[in-house]
Amino acid sequence: MKKIAFLFLLFFSLNSFSQTQLETDEEAYNNYYKADRELNIIYQQILKEYKSDAEFIKNLKTAQKIWITFRDAEMLAKFPKREPGYYGSIQPTCWSNYLQELTEERTKRLKIWLTGIEEGNMCSGSVNIK
């Protein structure tokens, strides 16, 4: 009897934590969306902080456009166009997760223009010194 009660509780506790594929896809997309919003906030802060450096701003905008092109190409390299169903029902989740990963990597790189580089770094380039 104890085994039956245990299995019954185990089944319902596991079932309560499960998600549908649609919920998993939605959660992954929302995580990507948050990462993308953060990237855009950081990008706008950089534009504001460095607004007096026209050459840097021009180059940053060019770099960001190229990064978007790279990101899109990277997505297609990881998930080439295939017949429907090739990647299975998990594909939207995988797509969003990889977009999130690429976006967070870009945000990390951009943040350096806001956090600055330690004084004494001879290769700071356009990045402000702390």
Go through the PLM ranges and name each one.
Residues 17-130:
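N-terminal alpha-helical modules
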Residues 3-18:
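Sec-dependent N-terminal signal peptides
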Residues 1-2, 105:
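Short, intrinsically disordered low-complexity segments
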